[in-house]
C-alpha cells in the first residue's frame, strides 16, 4: 500500500484491512458530530437495511462498509488545526493580494445569520480551496466545510485538512452504491445542521480558463436534503475566483498538448509552494446574486414544464451568475489583443485594440477587476511588464520602440487568461458572424431579422458545448441588444439592406469575432477535417486525437490556422463531443456517415472563413 493510500484511508482503515481492528458501527469518541448523529439516527439505519436488502447483502456488512465510508469523508473543525491551517493557507497564497468586495460580504453576513450558505465556486487553481474558506473566516462569516476530490487527500496533508473542514470525496462511485448512499446522507446531515458549504460546481479545475459545464452531484445531494428537511433556506452563492496570473497554468497547458497529468502528492505540494514565492499580482473574489434553493425549487415545480430538470436548470443558473460576477482583468484584455494579432505590437497598437473593447465592456456595465482603467497607458504597460516577468509575453526593445508579443509556446497560457473574460464577448462575436452570414446569403439584397436570428442560433448550436449560452428567448433578446451596440441600428425588428449591414460591420468601433471565436473554430476545423477523412470502421479516440495534434501542428506551420492555441487537446475533445452528439463518430456503418461528416466539415469551414472575413474588416479599420 502506498503512502498516498494510507493518507487517504487513514491508519485505522489500514488496520481494519489487515484484520487487526473491526469497523465500529457505533459512534467513536473521535468521530465528527455528523458521524455520531448519523450512526445514532433511526432513519439512517432503516435506509441502510433497505439498501442491504436491495443489494442482497448482510445488513451488518453494509453497516460496517457505510461506517467506513462515512469516517473516510467526514470533516471536522478543530480550532487549533484550523488556526494552523489558516497560517499555512496565507503563506501558500503569498503570491497574491486578495481583493474581496466589502459590500457583497455585508449582504452575505445578513443571509448567514438566518440561512445556510452553499458557495458554488469557479475553479481555476488548487489555491481556490484555500482562498475561499480563509476569506469566509477572515470576513467573519460562519465557517464552511469544503468538498474536494479524494486525489487531494494525500499523506501527510489529508488528515490535517480533514480537521479543518475538508471533505474528500471519490470521483468514480458508479459501482459503489453504499458510498453514494453515505455521501447523500452525510450531505443531508450537514444541511440539517445548518453548516455552510463550499464546492466547485465545475467538478474540477478548468483547463481553458473559462467555466466548464456544471457537475450536478453535490448540488443534487443538497437539493435532496432541502426536499427532505424543513428548516431555514439554503442560499446557493455563486462565487467567482479569478487571478491576474497563475503559476499552474503552464502545467495545465502542457496537458492540452497531450502530456500526462502529474499526480497530487507531497512532491506536488512542495512544487506548488515553491512557485508561490514569486509574486503574481492579485486574486479577485466576487459573489454573484445568491439563489434561494428551496424557493426556486417550489417555483419550478409549480410549473409542470419545469419538473424533472430542476437540478440542471439551477446549476446553469448558478454558472450564469458566476460569469456575471466575474470581473475583467487587465491580463485578459492584453492577452486578447496579443493573441488576436498573433504578432508583436507596440503599446499604442495594444491600446488601439483595448480602448474600444473597454468602451464595450463599460456599455455592458461589466466590472473591471480592481476598478482598473483599461484605457490608461500606464495600466496596460504595467500589465505587459508583469506578463514579461512571468514569461508569457516577450518584449523586444532594441529598435525604435518596444514591441510585445506572445512568448514561445505560451499561446495556451495567454489563451487561459483571455478566456477568463471570454463569456462577456461571445454573444457579441456571434452577432457579428450572424450579420455577416445573413448579408452574404441574401438573394434579394435584403437582410431579415429572422435570418440573422437563425444564423445566430446555428452558431449557438455549433458552440453549445464550448460556451454557456442563455436560454433561447434570452439569447434572442441579447442578440438584438448586441446588434444595437455594434452601430447605428434604429430598429432590429425590421429588415435592412445587405449593403447597410456590411457598412454597419465596416464602421463598428470594435469587431470581436476573430479575437473570440477563431481559436475555437480553427480547432473544430481540424477535428472535422480529420473526421471527414476517417475511413476505418472502428474509431480509436486516443489515436484520433493524437492525429489531430499532429495535423494541427502542420496547419499551424502552414498558417492554415491563426494561432498555436487552436492545437489543444481540450478543444479537440469538445469538438469531438459535438461530433458525437451529432452521431458522426460512432455508428460508422451508417450509409450516409461520410456525407454527413463532410457536411459537418463544410459547416465549420464556412464559419472559419467568415471569422477570417471579420478579421480582415477589423484590420482595415
From Swiss-Prot:
CDD domains tied to this protein: LPLAT_DHAPAT-like
Family: Belongs to the GPAT/DAPAT family.
Gene Ontology molecular-function annotations: glycerol-3-phosphate O-acyltransferase activity
Domain notes: The HXXXXD motif is essential for acyltransferase activity and may constitute the binding site for the phosphate moiety of the glycerol-3-phosphate.
Identification of the protein by name: Putative acyltransferase plsB1
The gene coding this protein: plsB1
InterPro entries (alphabetical): GPAT/DHAPAT, GPAT/DHAPAT_C, GPAT/DHAPAT_LPLAT, GPAT_PlsB, Plipid/glycerol_acylTrfase
A Pfam family that the UniProt record links to this protein: GPAT_C
Amino acid at each position: 500500500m502506498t503512502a498516498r493510500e494510507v493518507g487517504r484511508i487513514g491508519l485505522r482503515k489500514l488496520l481494519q484491512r489487515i484484520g487487526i481492528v473491526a469497523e465500529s458501527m457505533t459512534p467513536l469518541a473521535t468521530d465528527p458530530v455528523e458521524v455520531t448523529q448519523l450512526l445514532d439516527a433511526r432513519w439512517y439505519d432503516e435506509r441502510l437495511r433497505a439498501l442491504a436488502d436491495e443489494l442482497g447483502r448482510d445488513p451488518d456488512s453494509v453497516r460496517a462498509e457505510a461506517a467506513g465510508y462515512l469516517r473516510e469523508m467526514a470533516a471536522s473543525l478543530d480550532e487549533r488545526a484550523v488556526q494552523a491551517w489558516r497560517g499555512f493557507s496565507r503563506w501558500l497564497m503569498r503570491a497574491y493580494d486578495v481583493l474581496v468586495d466589502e459590500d457583497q460580504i455585508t449582504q452575505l453576513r445578513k443571509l448567514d445569520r438566518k440561512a445556510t450558505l452553499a458557495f458554488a465556486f469557479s475553479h481555476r487553481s488548487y489555491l481556490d480551496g484555500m482562498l475561499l474558506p480563509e476569506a469566509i473566516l477572515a470576513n467573519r462569516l460562519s465557517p464552511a466545510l469544503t468538498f474536494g476530490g479524494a486525489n487531494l487527500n494525500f499523506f501527510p496533508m489529508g488528515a490535517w485538512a480533514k480537521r479543518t473542514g475538508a471533505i474528500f470525496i471519490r470521483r468514480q462511485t458508479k459501482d459503489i452504491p453504499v458510498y453514494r448512499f453515505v455521501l447523500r446522507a452525510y450531505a443531508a446531515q450537514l444541511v440539517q445542521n445548518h453548516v455552510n458549504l463550499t464546492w466547485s460546481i465545475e467538478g474540477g479545475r478548468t483547463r481553458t480558463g473559462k467555466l466548464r459545464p456544471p457537475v450536478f452531484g453535490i448540488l443534487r445531494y443538497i437539493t435532496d436534503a432541502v426536499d427532505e428537511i424543513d428548516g431555514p433556506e439554503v442560499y446557493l452563492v455563486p462565487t467567482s475566483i479569478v487571478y491576474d496570473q497563475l503559476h499552474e497554468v503552464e502545467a495545465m497547458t502542457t496537458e492540452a498538448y497531450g502530456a500526462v497529468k502529474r499526480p497530487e502528492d507531497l512532491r506536488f505540494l512542495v512544487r506548488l509552494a515553491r512557485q508561490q514565492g514569486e509574486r503574481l499580482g492579485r486574486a479577485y473574489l466576487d459573489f454573484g446574486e445568491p439563489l434561494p434553493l428551496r424557493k426556486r425549487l417550489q417555483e419550478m415545480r409549480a410549473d409542470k414544464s419545469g419538473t424533472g430538470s430542476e437540478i440542471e436548470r439551477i446549476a446553469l443558473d448558478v454558472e450564469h451568475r458566476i460569469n456575471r460576477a466575474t470581473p475583467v482583468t487587465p491580463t485578459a484584455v492584453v492577452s486578447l489583443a496579443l493573441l488576436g494579432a498573433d504578432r508583436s505590437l507596440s503599446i499604442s497598437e495594444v491600446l488601439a485594440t483595448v480602448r474600444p473593447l473597454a468602451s464595450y465592456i463599460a456599455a455592458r456595465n461589466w466590472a473591471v477587476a480592481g476598478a482598473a482603467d483599461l484605457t490608461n497607458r500606464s495600466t496596460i504597460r504595467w500589465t505587459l511588464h508583469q506578463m514579461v516577468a512571468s514569461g508569457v509575453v516577450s518584449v523586444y526593445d532594441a529598435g525604435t520602440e518596444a514591441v510585445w508579443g506572445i512568448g514561445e509556446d505560451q499561446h495556451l497560457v495567454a489563451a487561459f487568461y483571455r478566456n477568463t473574460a471570454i463569456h462577456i464577448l461571445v454573444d457579441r462575436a456571434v452577432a457579428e458572424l450572424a450579420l455577416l452570414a445573413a448579408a452574404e446569403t441574401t438573394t434579394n439584397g435584403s437582410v431579415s431579422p429572422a435570418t440573422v436570428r437563425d444564423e445566430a442560433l446555428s452558431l449557438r448550436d455549433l458552440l453549445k458545448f464550448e460556451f454557456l449560452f442563455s436560454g433561447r428567448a434570452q439569447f434572442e433578446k441579447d442578440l438584438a441588444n448586441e446588434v444595437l451596440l455594434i452601430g447605428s441600428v434604429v430598429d432590429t425588428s425590421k429588415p435592412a439592406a445587405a449593403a447597410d449591414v456590411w457598412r454597419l460591420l465596416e464602421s463598428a468601433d470594435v469587431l470581436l469575432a476573430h479575437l473570440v471565436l477563431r481559436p475555437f473554430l480553427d480547432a473544430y476545423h481540424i477535428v472535422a477535417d480529420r473526421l471527414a477523412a476517417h475511413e476505418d470502421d472502428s474509431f480509436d479516440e486516443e489515436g484520433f486525437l493524437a492525429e489531430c495534434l499532429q495535423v494541427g501542428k502542420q496547419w499551424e506551420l502552414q498558417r492554415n490556422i491563426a494561432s498555436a492555441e487552436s492545437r489543444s487537446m481540450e478543444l479537440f475533445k469538445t469538438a469531438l463531443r459535438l461530433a458525437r452528439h451529432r452521431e458522426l463518430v460512432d455508428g460508422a456503418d451508417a450509409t450516409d456517415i461520410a456525407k454527413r461528416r463532410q457536411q459537418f466539415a463544410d459547416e465549420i469551414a464556412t464559419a472559419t472563413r467568415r471569422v477570417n472575413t471579420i478579421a480582415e474588416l477589423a484590420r482595415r479599420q
